[in-house]
Amino acid sequence: FPGVFAQGGFDAVIGNPPYGAFLATDEEKYLVNHYETISSFRDVYICFIEKAVNLLKQSGTFSYIIPSGWTGGPGYIKLRNFILTKKIRKILLLPFDIFSEAYIDTLVLVASKAIPNDNHVVETYVYPKKTKISEIRELAYQSIAQNTWLRTEDKKLILKNDSILLLTHLTQVGYSKIKNICDMKRGVLFDKKLLSPTPLTNQYHPYFEGDVYRYSINIRLVNWVEFSDKLREKPKEFKWFQGDRILLRRLVNRRQRLMGCFTDKTLITQPFFCKFESEIPIVL
């Protein structure tokens, strides 16, 4: 589109970018080298956001429907830093089952390439989770100053004013944070071709393929996997897969509750997990 870029770029970019796709090594290397927002979470939609901005003219606008995890997840700080330098116009946090075959929370993001001023206000709306929608009508948006998110911890995009006030209060009164007494890690990601029905070396360990529920666990150990650099993502040390810890599902259940349970078994897991280390006695 040489004519378009001669005029500075597109007026608008819209789409539903892919997410959750497994990347080959050469694809991952390409994205890391060409996109500043990509991080330890190799979600392709991150690159689509950056690409949309690069395709726009300075006054242009883009809108995507994408997962909502980037608004607060620890692996998306680069993306939040990037998007907060652009003028965010609207964020709509959508209800369950927008995509019937995908169990994932999504939102609609509308933003422009323009640089926001100190007084710029973002319109946000959080749908009740069980609402059924077929179109987006007039909504009672909340107004949040975009620079408010520059002052939240890790620049999290909190979409409700009452939640912002609550977090501000908790910060001021000095409540202890859970991160002061525990460490949280993400499990492993790898090509399932690395699984083996038997251990081939002493670096192979049982791979958890069961289910994590609220306070209970269904352990299914069929395969083994080697804890090595062959894994696409892993903690640096194997100790995180041993001893007392809490396994956490990445997605909350439909009642907006964390799904987590205790285990002390040695096994390699994919879910998030946390280990508590504190001078205060903690019984798991």
Question: Whereabouts are the PLM-identified features?
Answer:
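Signature of N6-adenine DNA methyltransferases within the class I
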Residues: 3-196, 268-272, 281
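Polybasic, glycine- and aromatic-enriched phosphate-binding surface used to engage nucleic acids
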Residues: 21, 46, 53-56, 163-284
